[in-house]
């Protein structure tokens, strides 16, 4: 078992070791761990601290980089092949709620995750799952996030999306001063920017 993903020809010895250890752990768990998984988070915590959120997340965030995403998805893929050879290779037995769809958020805002495009792409190409995203938005001045979301909403990944939800909130505590770059007026422009970026998705799927 080489633990390679479809776009990989080789991996380092350390990556192989990590993937093997994850695989060995996953196959000791009940098959429901994979077959009925719903929340699959590459990020925890949230900078926004919105007052309406019921999760009481802390105002800091940690997340997986692309290497970690690859290692975990590889281990999931090869573990799932012990139970099924048909896609999706995750959440394939969750018939009561959106079979084959993963939710990468619970106590976090996935819209601010800087590797979301890689997470969605690898989940779709390697596991055959679609991803639903939910966010309160992001600054239109953040070039990295804007380019990433434009890529997600383009023809490259649009079929890998299972829903795009925008929660209307003034980013909790940070959007308060009307004279700053985090004013409510700025937030309105950010919402407009978000809807413009994801217009291709809404046009295609409603």
Where are these regions (language model features)?
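N-terminal [4Fe-4S]-dependent radical SAM core
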Residues: 1-40, 57
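Residue-level signal for functionally critical sites in structured catalytic/ligand-binding pockets
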Residues: 3-4, 16, 29, 75, ...
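Short amphipathic alpha-helical segments, especially helix-boundary/capping motifs
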Residues: 14-15, 26, 50, 94-96
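N-terminal uDENN/longin-like adaptor modules and analogous extended polar/low-complexity scaffolding regions
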Residues: 22, 26, 46-49, 72-76, ...
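Core AdoMet radical
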Residues: 37, 54-70, 79-119, 123-144, ...
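Local cysteine-cluster metal-coordination motifs and their immediate loop/turn environment
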Residues: 45-57
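Catalytic cores of alpha/beta
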Residues: 146-150
């Amino acid at each position: 078992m080489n633990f390679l993903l479809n776009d990989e020809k080789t991996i380092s010895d350390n990556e192989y070791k990590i993937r093997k250890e994850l695989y060995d752990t996953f196959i000791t768990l009940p098959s429901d761990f994979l077959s009925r998984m719903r929340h699959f988070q590459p990020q925890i915590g949230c900078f926004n601290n919105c007052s309406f959120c019921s999760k009481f997340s802390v105002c800091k965030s940690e997340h997986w980089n692309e290497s970690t995403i690859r290692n975990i998805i590889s281990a999931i893929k090869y573990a799932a092949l012990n139970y099924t050879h048909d896609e999706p290779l995750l959440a394939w037995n969750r018939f009561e709620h959106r079979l084959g769809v993963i939710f990468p958020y619970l106590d976090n805002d996935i819209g601010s995750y800087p590797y979301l495009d890689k997470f969605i792409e690898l989940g779709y190409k390697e596991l055959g799952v679609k991803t639903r995203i939910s966010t309160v938005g992001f600054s239109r001045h953040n070039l990295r996030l804007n380019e990433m979301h434009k890529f997600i909403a383009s023809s490259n990944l649009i079929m890998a999306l299972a829903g795009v939800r925008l929660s209307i909130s003034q980013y909790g505590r940070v959007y308060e001063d009307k004279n700053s770059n985090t004013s409510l007026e700025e937030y309105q422009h950010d919402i407009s920017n978000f809807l413009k970026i994801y217009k291709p998705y809404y046009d295609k799927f409603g």
